[in-house]
């Protein structure tokens, strides 16, 4: 898949959440979500902040590095200090103000993404990323934080085949999830077989692998983004 296709799917996923937010009330924006201390407005503010830094990572790496240094500088103060930096400006805005800020930063990111080639690399928090993986990570973010919002408000968001991006990211970052938790990475291969929302089948890993995960793509994506426990899904 070309970077332009990933960018188009990202824009579509953002618009799906935009359409849901268009119909909610000011009280809904203040509703707590599953993320500690975060309201619906904070979820959107998080996307707003990091869509902007993502755009700068593409168009102005030096400016991005300054913002990265700022974030590293407050990280020792805990989650509250990070929230103050990344959400503080938005928390002073009205719900319509937060909504419009997100839309504006989405446009910045879309314009920046349009300059990327398939072989481009983008500076980011941690190692640099290939352009397609970089935009896939942004799609995963809007889908996952969108899930927090639809869960909090009881909204309906039908699954789509754009989940393939999220599932792909979940598969390829398996080893990193162990490393990040200071755990030994298992040597055994894993086969992942998922039923797509469209009815197609998606698969990763060798057939006959000693371990396998099977189920719906939506359940798999909910688990790899830590929005559901495996016991609360139909994954095998």
Residue ranges and their predicted role:
Residues 1-5, 52-110, 114:
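Short, helix-capping/interhelical loops that line the mouth of catalytic, cofactor-
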Residues 14, 18, 22, 51-55, ...:
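Structural signal for well-ordered, non-membrane alpha-helices
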Residues 1-6, 23-24, 30-31, 59-71, ...:
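Structured surface interface patches that mediate subunit assembly and partner/cofactor docking
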Residues 1-45, 54:
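An N-terminal domain-cap segment
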Residues 6-13, 43, 98-101, 105, ...:
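Amphipathic alpha-helix face/heptad-repeat signature
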């Amino acid at each position: 898949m070309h970077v332009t296709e990933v960018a188009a799917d990202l824009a579509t996923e953002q618009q799906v959440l935009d359409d849901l937010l268009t119909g909610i009330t000011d009280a809904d924006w203040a509703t707590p979500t599953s993320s500690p201390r975060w309201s619906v407005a904070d979820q959107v503010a998080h996307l707003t902040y990091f869509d902007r830094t993502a755009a700068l990572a593409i168009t102005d790496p030096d400016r991005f590095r300054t913002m990265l240094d700022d974030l590293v500088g407050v990280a020792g103060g805990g989650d509250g200090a990070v929230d103050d930096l990344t959400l503080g400006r938005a928390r002073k805005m009205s719900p319509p103000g937060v909504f419009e800020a997100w839309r504006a930063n989405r446009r910045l990111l879309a314009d920046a993404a349009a300059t990327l080639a398939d072989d481009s690399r983008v500076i980011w928090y941690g190692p640099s990323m290939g352009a397609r993986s970089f935009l896939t990570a942004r799609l995963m973010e809007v889908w996952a934080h969108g899930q927090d919002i639809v869960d909090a408000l009881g909204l309906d968001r039908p699954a789509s085949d754009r989940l393939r991006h999220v599932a792909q990211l979940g598969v390829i970052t398996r080893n990193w999830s162990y490393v990040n938790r200071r755990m030994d990475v298992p040597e055994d291969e894993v086969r992942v077989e998922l039923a797509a929302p469209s009815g197609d089948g998606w698969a990763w890993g060798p057939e006959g692998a000693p371990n396998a995960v099977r189920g719906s793509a939506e359940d798999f994506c909910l688990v790899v983004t830590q929005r559901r426990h495996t016991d609360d899904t139909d994954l095998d």
